[in-house]
Curated annotation (Swiss-Prot):
One of its GO terms (cellular component) is ribosome. Keywords: Ribonucleoprotein, Ribosomal protein. GO terms for molecular function: structural constituent of ribosome. It comes from the Bacteria. Residues 1-44 are annotated as: Disordered. This is Large ribosomal subunit protein bL34. The gene is rpmH.
């Protein structure tokens, strides 16, 4: 059986990357929350 997680750097960046987060209001909210929490990594 094929596993469900088949890693792809491009897919990861497009779905969860910084530019994708910045492109929507809710995405920016996610980044703001992660900054507030003090996350070292903000986006994939």
């Amino acid at each position: 059986m094929k596993r469900t997680y088949q890693p792809s750097k491009i897919r990861r960046a497009r779905k969860h990357g910084f530019r994708n987060r910045m492109s929507t209001k809710n995405g920016r909210r996610v980044l703001a929350a992660r900054r507030r929490k003090g996350r070292k990594v903000l986006a994939a």
